[in-house]
Regions:
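Class I S-adenosyl-L-methionine-dependent methyltransferase catalytic core
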Residues: 1-24, 29-44, 139-140, 159-172, ...
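Non-catalytic nucleic-acid substrate-recognition regions in nucleic-acid-modifying enzymes
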Residues: 1-187
Length: 403
């Protein structure tokens, strides 16, 4: 069983992820806030890794029920120890993890191999202490040597009320796994991270496949509010692009949306722009690096008057100023109105679609009122963007003529 996680998405926006998974692997899924679960055969694992809508991928090693006392910490932690010792069988998941990540080292070292590796571990620790480029989330397992003993860490996440804290559970479970598999504990340069999710009276053990989040792609030159690539893909997917569609991002910032569009929808044409010269230069650099051969064009313009023909655009996907980290809410009240009216002019009636991300709901609703009957809201979805509870509005251009 695989677990695909997107910590930025929740609520109705998760529908897009579910659709993506059904499209990619043709299997049913179970969802919970920020997570989707599905069973997948070995020959479909590559497709899972190709999914553009998810941040992290895990293999679910075991799901076990426990009966915590809820009061006696020592008894509850002992229960965790016993369950890991007697019931947690990770061999199948470990073999899958080794194959997927291409880890060449020793997943099942002998006690002698462990003790020999432990002797050299102090030297390795000294090297880590003097290095200034240690990764915050482990290292790429594929970069290990054939004789390397597996380095690991255990992270515990809890939902519900328990008699113990998450670090205490992680320490107990991690120690038991070390006794069981003879791995080296390493909290910073580990090959494998094991996530133990304790949800009320259930413990779910997961092995991380992605040593870094999949949203870290495409962008080399970041702006103050660069959007995650995974969110960009889901925004684009909500617009249902067709071959030949002209898609614009009028507020492209660092170019995250048009780059993702150019890579994911190569048969569509992407046009993007921004009014800030620095943003245009950043976008140009990122486009040249990430998708130089894609159908992505860039220009500098003002969204108050877009240099585009009437009824010429099929899709608009953009990240509007939030009024928090970029722009001001007082400015948004004017900007949003002018922007929506321009979109009413350039977007094709009846077939045109808009997917707009914003934190400033009030300014957006006022702008919608000003736009009159030019648009119809078909869906409003929630998305967490850097801790801000933003909204995605999916709009359809009506047949009303722009005047």
């Amino acid at each position: 069983m695989d677990n695909a996680e997107n910590s930025s998405l929740y609520g109705l926006f998760q529908e897009s992820l579910t659709d993506d998974n059904l499209f990619m692997i043709g299997t049913s899924v179970d969802t919970e806030r920020g997570n989707i679960y599905f069973n997948v055969p070995w020959d479909q694992l590559v497709k899972v890794q190709e999914m553009r809508s998810i941040d992290n991928i895990f293999i679910v090693g075991s799901i076990l029920k426990l009966m915590f006392d809820g009061i006696n910490k020592e008894a509850d932690l002992k229960l965790c120890t016993n369950v890991v010792h007697n019931n947690v069988k990770l061999e199948k998941a470990l073999n899958a993890w080794k194959s997927i990540t291409q880890f060449p080292g020793k997943v099942y070292p002998t006690i002698n191999e462990y003790e020999e590796a432990l002797k050299h571990d102090k030297i390795f620790d000294n090297l880590k202490a003097t290095s200034s480029k240690i990764r915050k989330r482990g290292q790429n397992p594929a970069d290990a040597e054939i004789n390397d003993v597996l380095r690991y860490r255990v992270t515990c996440e809890r939902i519900g009320t328990h008699s113990f804290e998450s670090p205490e559970a992680a320490r107990i479970i991690g120690g038991e796994l070390q006794d069981k598999y003879h791995w080296l504990v390493d909290l910073s340069t580990y090959h494998l991270e094991i996530i133990c999710k304790i949800i009320k009276n259930e413990i779910v053990t997961q092995l991380r496949i992605t040593h870094e989040s999949k949203h870290h792609r495409n962008i080399m030159h970041f702006g103050p509010t660069t959007l995650r690539a995974t969110i960009c893909y889901n925004l684009l997917r909500l617009a249902h692009p067709n071959p030949g569609d002209i898609i614009i991002d009028p507020m492209c910032g660092s170019g995250s949306i048009p780059i993702e569009g150019g890579l994911a929808y190569e048969n569509s044409y992407m046009l993007c722009g921004d009014n800030h010269t620095k943003a245009v230069l950043r976008s140009k650099s990122n486009i040249n690096i990430s998708c130089p051969k894609s159908k992505v064009d860039l220009t500098q313009w003002s969204v108050s008057y877009l240099p585009l023909l009437n009824s010429s655009i099929d899709i608009v996907v953009t990240d509007m100023p939030f009024g928090k980290r970029s722009g001001k809410i007082s400015d948004n009240r004017v900007l949003y109105k002018e922007f929506l009216l321009q979109l009413g002019r350039v977007v094709k009636p009846i077939t045109g679609r808009l997917v707009l991300l914003t934190y400033d709901r009030r300014s957006f609703h006022l702008a919608l009122q000003r736009a009159g009957n030019l648009f119809r809201v078909t869906k409003m979805l929630g998305v967490n963007v850097g801790g801000l509870h933003a909204a995605v509005y999916v709009l359809k251009r009506t047949k009303i003529e722009y005047k």
